[in-house]
A protein has these predicted regions:
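Positively charged n-region of N-terminal signal peptides that target proteins for export
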Residues: 1-4, 8
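Conserved N-terminal structural module of periplasmic/extracytoplasmic solute-binding proteins
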Residues: 6, 19-195, 230, 239-246, ...
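Hydrophobic core
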Residues: 9, 13-17
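Loop/turn elements at helix/coil->beta-strand transitions in domains of secreted/extracellular proteins
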Residues: 36-40, 66-71, 90-95, 113-116, ...
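Extracytoplasmic/periplasmic substrate-binding proteins
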Residues: 45-54, 158-173, 180-186, 220-276, ...
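Carboxylate/His-rich catalytic cores and anion/metal-binding grooves
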Residues: 113-142, 197-201, 209-243, 299-323
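Helix-loop-helix "hinge/cap" segment bordering the ligand-binding cleft or interdomain interface
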Residues: 119, 148-149, 153-225, 244-295, ...
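Conserved small-residue motifs centered on glycine
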Residues: 375, 379-499
Length: 538
């Protein structure tokens, strides 16, 4: 099976390489100006970043290299929206906004003339111009309805390596020791899943004489811990209720499809038999992790990005840190096949973070600041922006770069943020990732393809849907309508879905009337907005 998956991925890589050319980016001649130039910027930092960008080693070195000095002001994310409103209302704008504005802000302030139309300065931006020419998805994501570009993106193909466009957020793990103790096989169908979960519940697989086993757990309101693919995919859709699906070019929410009813009936069966964690629909990740990290195994199956956050490294990948080598407690499983032969997994756009840098229209010497911004896309700058300054965090090699992993006794994210905010524009392509090994603390080397998440993705990627809703830019009018309609509709969806899954109501009997009530709230208008936006990209 593993060889087959590897072959499929290899074919997809070849297809991807044929379909999309890599951007041509290069390091500009430094300094960018012989006369030092000063600019000021507002920036919103990563949640755990408490440092001062003015003191980060990469940014200090960048100023010395380019001749462009940036005075950074950190804006707390908790007051971000308020600060945006008051800043633009005052008319006293900083030169730059970093990781500060969303598409709605860019639409409002770009089309009003407060933001610089970067698309008018592409002659000074050869790197970004090449990105637009070779990456149509990026161009679509950053171009506003007036045809102009006001924000520069961060593009990181590390998350979709090896570049076949398959982004795998969730993986499902099963307790291998419990399977072996009970003489069970890994389930491959929904029927087999029920039998395995029943055995986990009834036969005391953790051996403590207490009925404390949790056959299946997840976090309904989570991120990678959600059951959107695992429990809905076998019925031919990607849930949950509020998940936007695309099939044969048609846009719809999961809850609008009759297959959603069958999926919820299945989930309700699991719930009624006590096979789903009683807290699955209400717990947060902190509670989810706490149960998984108990010394005695409680989870029979769980859903996560890579497993270690939930049950710890040793149980997820074993002492050797490698997947499926025999000493781990939990192993990943492939998507299940449903009663009608359906077997699909989610896919979604990833790797492009828009509006990482916007420029005020009042900026002095816009040509220079555009050249400075374009230099951020150069390979050396991009690698350092995302993974730290050369010397401590990275090393240059003859073939490219070598990433240095964090020491074992420090928090890797906090360590990395000592030199960079990781928030500015950057470009990491598939070609760059392919020749970017990591040197680990024990001295061994590993490629991206060796990492746990890539191995997990190999298991689910062959089942990933080919159609999914892309990054699109809605018009100002469409954004306004979505802002008015969507929140109450989504809240109603979630409340009713959870009720049906947990036995508070009959989904089969109540579903038609509930869809009518959603339509009366404007659901069909929301779908039409997204359908029209998708059609406009073709």
């Amino acid at each position: 099976m593993k060889k087959l998956v590897a072959l499929l991925l290899a074919v997809l890589m070849v297809m991807s390489a044929a379909a999309f050319a890599e951007p041509v980016v290069s390091e500009p001649e430094m300094p960018l100006t012989d006369t030092p130039a000063n600019y000021d910027a507002m920036i919103v930092l990563h949640g755990m970043d408490v440092g001062d960008p003015n003191e980060k080693s990469l940014y200090v070195a960048r100023e010395e290299q380019t001749g462009v000095n940036i005075e950074w002001t950190v804006i707390p994310s908790t007051s971000q929206a308020e600060r945006i409103a008051t800043t633009f209302a005052s008319g006293e704008l900083p030169d730059l906004f970093a990781n500060m504005l969303n598409n709605s802000d860019v639409l409002t302030y770009g089309m009003s003339g407060a933001l610089l139309p970067i698309s008018g300065y592409l002659e000074y931006m050869p790197n970004f111009s090449s990105i637009l020419e070779t990456m149509p998805d990026v161009k679509a994501a950053v171009t506003m309805p007036d045809g102009k570009i006001y924000g520069l993106p961060q593009i990181n193909m590390w998350s979709v390596w090896p570049g076949n466009g398959v982004y795998q957020r969730s993986s499902v793990f099963i307790n291998k020791n419990w399977l072996e103790k009970l003489g069970l096989e890994v389930p491959t169908t929904t029927d087999e899943l029920i039998e395995v979960l029943r055995a986990f519940k009834e036969q005391d697989p953790n051996g403590n004489g207490i009925a404390d086993e949790i056959p299946l757990s997840f976090v309904y309101n989570g991120w990678s811990e959600i059951p959107a693919s695992f429990l809905y995919g076998p019925f031919g859709i990607i849930g949950m209720s509020y998940q936007l699906n695309v099939q044969d070019g048609k846009v719809f929410y999961a809850i609008q499809d009759e297959r959603f009813v069958e999926a919820v009936k299945f989930i309700n069966t699991l719930w009624n038999e006590g096979l789903i964690d009683s807290e699955a629909f209400t717990q947060d990740t902190k509670r989810y992790y706490a149960k998984g990290l108990e010394e005695t195994d409680l989870y029979g199956m769980f859903i996560d990005w890579a497993g270690s956050s939930v049950v710890g490294n040793e149980k997820a990948v074993g002492a050797d840190g490698l997947l499926n080598t025999g000493d781990e407690t939990y192993i990943p499983i492939a998507p299940l096949t449903g009663p009608n032969g359906d077997c699909i997994w989610s896919n979604e756009p990833a790797g492009v973070n828009t509006n990482r840098l916007c420029i005020a229209s009042t900026v002095e010497n816009p040509e220079l600041i555009c050249r400075w911004a374009d230099a951020l896309y150069a390979p050396d700058s991009s690698i350092q922006e995302l993974w730290g300054q050369f010397g401590t965090y990275n090393e240059k090699t003859e073939d490219g770069w070598m990433r240095i992993a964090a020491p074992n006794d420090v928090n890797a994210d906090e360590w990395l943020l000592e030199s960079t905010t990781r928030q500015l524009p950057a470009l990491v392509t598939n070609e760059m990732v392919a020749k970017y090994p990591t040197k680990f603390a024990d001295g061994h080397m590993g490629m991206k393809s060796d990492e746990i998440k890539c191995q997990l993705a190999e298991i689910t990627a062959p089942y990933a849907v080919k159609e999914y809703y892309p990054n699109v830019v809605l018009s100002a009018e469409a954004n306004e309508r979505i802002a008015v309609l969507w929140t109450p509709i989504k809240n109603a969806m979630i409340e009713q879905e959870v009720a049906w899954c947990t036995g508070e109501g009959d989904v089969e009997a109540e579903w038609p009337a509930f869809i009518e009530s959603l339509n009366s709230m404007g659901l069909q208008e929301v779908v039409e907005i997204y359908q029209n936006a998708l059609d406009a990209t073709k």
